């Protein structure tokens, strides 16, 4: 909660607890406005934002022991993007074009499908959800040409790939069983890759 509060201050009051909760807890973290079926609830947190009070439930997915050899490869585009600015951009877009709200609903449905696949150890299903999510995010205009190139380069060697974070720059992530090939593909596009095992542990106090 302290880390989330610090991030919110840096992002001018707009920040979800996703990054800080994942870094602290490790594994597979699900951040939602409520407890999510099929997950284990850990704690709740809230934040006063320029748009009003926000509340989140922090949940985790206990991965099956036979999940297999799966990796996440992050690709940094080299361009930063303040979360607050991108959140405001999407809010303004939906305000001007209310029909775009269906993309937000699509992302919610895709996320639930991906969560079901992850809980069952279905990596192919999870990858399909990631691909579909990226397309919806593109329609919300939060992707960039660089992120799209990195995602496209990673997909032939991945189960799925999408932008991660607020968009507008920043990073993409690919789910793969061949992290070396994906890292090479990201580097060819000018991105900087980082590999981590799916379900890695969070912060450890030494």
Description of each model-found segment:
Residues 4-14, 20-162, 166, 173-206:
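C-terminal nucleotide
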């Amino acid at each position: 909660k302290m880390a989330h509060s610090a991030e919110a201050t840096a992002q001018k009051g707009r920040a979800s607890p996703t990054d800080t909760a994942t870094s602290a807890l490790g594994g597979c973290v699900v951040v939602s406005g409520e407890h999510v079926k099929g997950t284990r609830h850990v704690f709740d947190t809230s934040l006063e934002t320029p748009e009003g009070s926000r509340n989140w439930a922090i949940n985790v997915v206990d991965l099956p022991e036979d999940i297999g050899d799966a990796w996440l490869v992050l690709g940094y585009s080299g361009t930063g993007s303040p979360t607050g600015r991108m959140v405001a951009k999407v809010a303004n877009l939906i305000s001007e074009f209310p029909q775009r709200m269906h993309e937000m609903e699509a992302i919610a449905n895709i996320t639930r499908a991906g969560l079901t696949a992850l809980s069952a150890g279905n990596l192919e299903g999870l990858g399909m959800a990631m691909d579909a999510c990226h397309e919806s995010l593109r329609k919300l205009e939060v992707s960039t040409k660089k992120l799209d190139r990195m995602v496209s380069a990673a997909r032939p060697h991945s189960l799925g790939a999408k932008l991660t974070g607020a968009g507008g720059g920043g990073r993409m992530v690919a789910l793969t069983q061949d992290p070396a090939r994906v890292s090479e593909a990201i580097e060819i596009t000018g991105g900087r890759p980082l590999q981590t095992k799916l379900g890695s542990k969070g912060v450890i106090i030494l």
